[in-house]
Structures are given as structure tokens and as C-alpha cells.
Amino acid sequence: MDVTAIFAGDILVQSREYLIPNDVVDVDGGIKAVRPPIIQPPPGRKLPLIDFPGSSWDFLTYFAPSKTVKRQSSSSSDNTSDKEEVETEETRGMFVQLGDTAHEACPFATNEADSSSTVSIISPSYASRGSIVPSWLKRKFLGRVSLGFVYEGSSGSSVGSESTCSLMTPSLEFPDRISFRKKDFSEKGPSRHVWEKRKLTRAKLIENFCNPEDIEPVTSWLKGQLLGEESFASVYEAISDSSVGSESTCSLMTPSMEFPDRISFRKRDFSEEGPSGRVKEKRKLMRNKLIENFRKPEDITSWLKGQLLGRGSYASVYEAISEDGDFFAVKEVSLLDKGIQAQECIQQLEGEIALLSQLQHQNIVRYRGTAKDVSKLYIFLELVTQGSVQKLYERYQLSYTVVSLYTRQILAGLNYLHDKGFVHRDIKCANMLVDANGTVKLADFGLAEASKFNDIMSCKGTLFWMAPEVINRKDSDGNGSPADIWSLGCTVLEMCTGQIPYSDLKPIQAAFKIGRGTLPDVPDTLSLDARHFILTCLKVNPEERPTAAELLHHPFVINL
């Protein structure tokens, strides 16, 4: 008989002995077969179902009984028992329980010279080790279980050519010989019905987990960053072509009547000794007026500040949670004197709060109120969880379907804004956020960078999306809405290519190119609809650019 060791961490199981003391057949010093057991082991611990290639794991239950078992022999002919003690052995081993064999008849074939040692067991559920194999060699790694590792091994006392220690036993049929050799579970093998049963179980599992009727199945998607790992699975972020929502919002929008008449490169002296010596006192009055004009559509009285989401020159944006467990975004602005930039900061805050409090639309970031302390102003806004479109195209290569869906949502928000007489003035991927449902929301977490148009050199990345009339210090449209359309064309180009417009130029070089009416490079590899949409937006003459309402009927955003 084979004496094959199975190692799983500190667990060693042998196929040599079965410690059930009722009617034991002793062949060559080893117990080969038994009748139905009398001793029932205590409840044990079940391990998860694990499958290795070409083999089958069953549920394993292990016990560590400390009692001493006396072996007794009996005669199957007269059903009388020999009371003489044959051997005493301490059961320190591990039982292996076969989960699905409780009602299977499992014959044990033993030595041909001893025909009486062949018996049939109605419930052969338990096995235990005898003595530890003193000499064995560890070979290749087979797998990992909760209790340790399983290796292929060979014993110095093993019989036969196979010495694989796999500890994998079929659940529906017990082998004719007690052996831990690998079994053939292919369709042509002796355990074909096991294979077929697994296929049926797998098919039933898939059938039971199909999508509900009210949920559109995901047919095309891209895998993103790893979110977490579990025992049997890993969880990733993913983006779908068909799961993008229909809502979009817009944040940091400046009233059109405040569009600057011209852009100057001169720095202004806001010190007390300068030509604007009374500006400090004026700043205090503006700050007090801003605080007095707070609107609180929602009463957020107690909240905790969380992780940083973004930072600009004037403001930082944090995640926050209220005492009711509601999450939102907090834009934190210092009210301390910031020198020559303080007046502009306060003007921006006043304009943004006034604008957000007026807008109520599904495509506009929801304004949730304001608060203040001694030195800081807090603006509460809707929290958008998935980050900016810029971060998304850096993680994924956005398909034309996704770009088209995002563009349609941006247009819906711009159309509402322009009808209200406002312009956004900073349309770009970094200012568009996406929630978990694929809804695009325009925002600006870098408050200062979003509307600092008095100094082109300080506009940093914003300059690359500016329209020619903005660079050339004129607003020929009256309310500036064509400037948003130009920026939208640059934004769609950015989403399609994964690069900002004029990416090969420095800011000052790009300013001269844009001012002269030189278009950014639009690759010929883009789809015809995408290319036509971008070039339609990038008309040098603002009067030739379509409105947001007209672009909502463009084939690029309706032929999905």
C-alpha cells in the first residue's frame, strides 16, 4: 500500500491508517478497510472549496482528538469479536472529511491474498494519519489553502511510481485504492460525471447572476486601477461605454457682464503707498459684505474635514462629512490679507457664490451653503467622486462613445448657462468632474487659476484653451459665449488625443499662435464626426461659431 505524505503547512496526512475501531482489517501492519464507524469525531472546521488544474478539492474537516483508540479484530463469519487487545495507539492525527460522500458506497480493495479484507463501507467519511513519515522530499508547489501550502512530495517508503501529494479527492466517487495520486477529471477520464456536474453548476451560477431586466448589460468596458483584493477576487475600477449618465454640471462660472475689457501684462500696485492706497480699506468692506450676503440653502452646522481633493492659489478643496453622514465638498478660502491679489480673490468669491446660488439645473454643481470662522470662508458644494476628465483620460483611453457622451452633457450645461446670460470662461478637462454614474459636472477646484484673466502669464494651463478674441483683448460677442465654444472644441480635442491643445508650445508661444488665429493640430486619425465637430468650434471669427443649442444637434453627439 502507498504511504504518501500530504503537507499543508503543519498538517501531515497519511493514507496508511483509518482510526475507526469497529471491525478493522489489518494487512501488513496497516489498516486497509473498516465497517461503518462508531466513533464520530467532533464538529470541525471547514475550509473553502479550492480547485487545482486537473483535480478536485473537497470540503476538509480536521480534528485533533486526544483519546486512545484500541484496535480490535472481529470475524465477519460468526459476528463475534475477539476481546484481546491487539494494539493501542494515540490519535493525534488529522481527519479528512469528504463532503459529498456521506451516502456513497465506497469499496476498499486490499491485498489479494486476504480476500476477507475486502469490505464495503456505507459512510466512509473520516481518515487520520498514523506515524509521521520520517523521510520525504518536497517538490513543486501545488497551491495554497487556509491552513498552509500544498506541495508535491515523495516519501522514502512510498510504493509505486507516483508520489504526488495533492490532497485532492473527488467528491462523488471514492477511489478503488486508497491513494493520493492525482485523478483525471477531463471529459474522457473516469470522473466524467464530476466534470459534467461542474459544468452544469457553473452554467446555473451564470444564469442566476444575469442582469435584472431594468439594468442595461455592460458590453464594452475598460479596467482601471485596483481598488482592493479579497480571498477569491480582486476589485477594479472600470469605465463603460454605455453607462455614462445624461447629466452634466458646471462650476466656477463668472457673470458675463464682468468679462474684462482688455488683458494687461502690467502688475498693479495695491500697497498703501501706491496709486490705490485706499484699496486695503475697500477690501475690508468687500469682505464684510461678502460674509453678510451668505446664503445657506442647507443647514450644515456640524461637519468634519477629510482628505484634500485639490488646491489652487486662493482655495483648497476638501472632502467633508456632515453629522448626518452626508458627504460633500468644501472649498476653503483664507480671508486674511493676500496683498495685491486679495481684491481679485474676494471679487471671485462674491461672483461665484452669487452665481451658484442663482442656478438650479441638473447640469450645474449644487451649491449647498457657506460658513466662516475667524480667518476662513467655507463654500459647501456637491461632491463628485471620480475626479476630473483629465484624470480619467490619463487612466483610460477614452473611446469616441465616451467622449461623445461627455460632450453632450457639457453642451447641455453650457446651453443653460448661456441662456441665463453667463459664461464659464474656463472649459477644459481639468475642470470637468465625473461621478460614479458617468455624469459630467463642470467645476474648478483651483479657484484662482480658473478666472485670472488680468494677467495672461499667470493663467498657466488655462491659456491653451483661450479663444483668439480673449487673447486679442476684445469681446466682440457681447456676452462672451463664443469663447466657451472655442474652449469646448479644444476640450473635445483634448479628450480624443489625451493631450492639451498646443502641447508642443510654451504658454507665451501659444498666446501668439492663438492671437494670430492658428488652430491647434487636429489629427486626421480622428473620426469624421469628431474632427468636424472640433473644427466647427474652432472658428477664428466668433460670429461664425455655432451656439451650444445648435451643437446639441451635431452628428457627433446624437449618433451614439
UniProtKB/Swiss-Prot annotation:
Pfam families: Pkinase
Tissues with expression: Expressed at low levels in roots, stems, siliques, leaves, seedlings and flower buds.
Active site: 426
Taxonomic superkingdom: Eukaryota
Keyword annotations of the record: ATP-binding, Kinase, Nucleotide-binding, Serine/threonine-protein kinase, Transferase
Region (Disordered): 70-91
Residue numbers binding ATP: 309-317, 331
MF terms (GO), sorted A to Z: ATP binding; MAP kinase kinase kinase activity; protein serine kinase activity
Domain Protein kinase: 303-557
Reactions it catalyzes: L-seryl-[protein] + ATP = O-phospho-L-seryl-[protein] + ADP + H(+); L-threonyl-[protein] + ATP = O-phospho-L-threonyl-[protein] + ADP + H(+)
SMART domains per the UniProt record, alphabetical: S_TKc
Enzyme class: transferase
E.C. code: 2.7.11.25
Disruption phenotype: No visible phenotype under standard growth conditions.
Family: Belongs to the protein kinase superfamily. STE Ser/Thr protein kinase family. MAP kinase kinase kinase subfamily.
This protein's name: Mitogen-activated protein kinase kinase kinase 3
Species of the source: Arabidopsis thaliana (Mouse-ear cress)
Gene behind this protein: MEKK3
